[in-house]
Structure formats: structure tokens, C-alpha cells
Amino acid sequence: MYTRVFDRTEEETCSVDAVVPDALGDLSALVVTEGTFCLWNLAFSDKSAQIEGCIAADVVYAEENGALRSFPVELPVKVHMSGETLAEDVRPWLRCTLAALDARAVNSRKVRVTARLSLCLRAYRETELALTERIESEGGAVFTHTEPLCVHVPVAVEEQTFTATQMHRFSDGQPETERLLCHAETVLLDEVHIADGRAVVQGRVRTSVSYLQQGQSCPVSETFETPFSQLLDCPADAEPCLVQASVSLTAAYLNVSTAADGATLEAEYHLVAQTVCFGELTAECVTDAYCNTAQLQLEWETIPAGTVQQAEPLHLAAEGMIACDAAALTVCAQRAELCGAASDGCDVLVRLLVTDAEQHVSCLEKRLHLQFETGGTRGELLYALPEAPAVTATADGFQLRAAVTVDEAQFCPSEFRQVTGVTVQERVCPYAAVPSLTIVRWNGEDLWQLSKRYCSSERCIRETNGLLDDDVPVELPQYLLIPKTEV
């Protein structure tokens, strides 16, 4: 099994000043900045973790004459996290979310691109669940009470790299000069489950592209989806029952090609999948003890235990308003993307590309928050699927409605205390006044409590009164014969 030794969510902000290429005209107005984060490396060393990657962005702007142009910008990402529990032998689980990407003009030839990245990093170390099965003492016979422990623990933490490729055909036209104005990729998980002891991760890479057609000033936007399906082994002693997965993009290659029958987009994506599989562990452990010849001081340990189960999918929606003169604008593209996720909610960014009467293109954005209702239990986001936004023009602006399907796991923690050792307080029998044979009226009281009270043992009481586990009478006796256990 594994135990989580590190869990931290940090936000990293990075920026870069980019110069408009010499082949392009001066910048008059910024339109939109699209981009994607690619994870290049994740490594652990003693008490630290290093995350390296890059945000590949496209800055779309308008020249003085209104013509749209774009150029690529790269924002390097280097994040260092420190933690006393980190070491080279831990295994990672990382979720990256591009929370914000923006650009502003410094002058007509320079822009400053700023990005905010949310990183949720967890580390797991292989370990054993130390349970107390018996207690021994030099002070005499120690009687123990055991209870069954049933918990869900990480039993496998795996990582796998893979590639997804597909050829897409442009349906709305042909890109001018065989290049895109901008593009952005999002990895969506459709289903994550356990089948035949292995983790099944199914999803798609959604690519949103914008391009100009020959002789047109208004951009065309299309969305292409490249599916993927991966099987990850779960080498573990316990049968896995639930899996939490994260899939990160490590590289994206897009190529536009034209032919007599139309234009196509060749998409090749390199990805890494990380999974944490939970399995059910059952064991008997000591929860109480006493000695018939001495007073004992018990040593306790709290086990961070709990169970986990997948909840029913949540269908959430949030509404908002972009204040503007909607009657004077035409929406030419709209989409919603996840820009933040936590255990209690997620953020969705709704982005509209609009044109006015003079065919000037601009971008309108609105961030909407959706709250999860977990019913008091601790929820863990498995994945979230944003749907296409609904946009309605009103007298006050554009009314937005964003819907998201959220799959969650519910964690029910339980503080389980076990006895790990005993210390003899005094070597005199604390039960000297207890008679050697006692008859008590039984009202269903716990046998372990009776055994401690009358210096007996639970097993002895069961044997004396015919209450063996394999031969329980239909009618329980009203009285119990409790013999005092000899040392």
C-alpha cells in the first residue's frame, strides 16, 4: 500500500515580454491570447520537487488597418516545492490547470504576456499499515479486545506516457496561408474506472482553433477532438475499487495541409497519465486491553483511516452577464473552459469572440464559479466536463449560462485508535475482590466490558455460556455465568 506524504496546491505566475516579429505590422489593439501548458519534467530530490514546463501561447492582435495577425510566445515554467517528506523514492500525482492567460500592449511593437498556473502536487510513498495484533506484558496475562478495521487506502500509484494522433478535416473553410491564428488544447476525462484489476482512463484532447479564410477579415473558429484510451496496471495485493487519474499534455504538434478536396489538421499529442488506485483493506487490530494481575497504562495510536466511494455525477450550472451593447455585436465564436478546480467547486471561463458593424474583432470574457454540494463529507474531484455555453443577447448585454458535469469521490474519514503497547503501573491484582464465579443479568451489554469488570475473558464467557461464533443460539440467555480467569 501507499500513504500520501505530500499534498500541496500552489499558483505560479510567470510573464514574458514578446516583440512583434519584423514581418508583421504594428500592433493597434489586442484581440485575444490563447495558450496551453505542457509538462516537460517532474522530478523529486531530497526534500524538494521540481516541475518544468512551458506555456505555448498565440497573441492575436489587430493592425491599424484592422487586419488580424498573430505570433507565438513561449512562457517557461519552473516551479520548486519544498517538503520534509519528499525524497527520490516517492511517486507523483500532478494536476495542472491554466487559470489565467492575458496580454497587454507595452507599445506598438511589444506585448507583455502573463499567465497564472495552478499546480496540485501529491506524493505517495510505499509503506505498510502497522496494526497491533497482540499485546504482551511481563506483568501477567494480558487480555485484548480486537475490532475489524475496514479502510480504503492507495494500493497502486502508476504513471504512463502515450501518444494520441488524428487527422481532422476543416468543415467551415480553408485557413489562409496554411496557418492558424491561434489554438488552445484542453485534456478532458470522460471516464475513469477499474476493469479486471487495471485502471481504464478514457478521454479526449479538445483543440479550439481560430483561422482566417482567404479574403476574409472575420476569424473562423472550429473545435476538434482527439480521443484516447489507456490501460494502466495496478500491481497490488488488494483488489482496486476506485481510481483517481490525471492526464497532462507534454507536447502538441499541429500541422495544416491543403488539398484539392479541402484542408486538414494533423494533430499529434504526447501525454502522461498518472493514477492512484484505492483498494479495500480489512484487518483485526487491538483496540483495548487489560491484565488480571496488574494495572496497565495503555499506549495509543490514531490511524488515519477512512473509506472512499464514487458519488453520483453532479450536473451544475452557473449564470452570469457580460455588460455590453449586445445588439451592436455579432458572436462569431464561443466556448467554455475549466480554469480552476478544487474539492468544493470549480471555475469556468466563458470566452466570446465578437465583431461589430465595422467587422472589428474583440474578445469578451466572464469567469463563473460553480459550487459543489458534498453533504458535509469531504469530496475529491475526479474530473469535470464543461459543456458549450449558452449565450443570449439582452438589452443589458450577453446573458451566459455554463454547465459542467462533475464526477466526485466522497471520503468518509474515521479516527481509528489502536493499542500499540502497555506499561505496568503496579504489580498487585486490581480484581482481588472479584468472586471466582459470578452470575449477572444480561441486557445485551458488550461482553468485553463484562470481561474487564469481572476479570474474565471474552472468549471464556462465550465458551461458558454457549455463545461461540459458530454456534450462536437463536434466543440469547437472560443471565450469564462469568468465571474469573486464573492467572
Describe each PLM feature range:
Residues 1-433:
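Membrane-lipid interaction segments
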Residues 426-463, 468-487:
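Primarily a LysM-type cell-wall glycan-binding module
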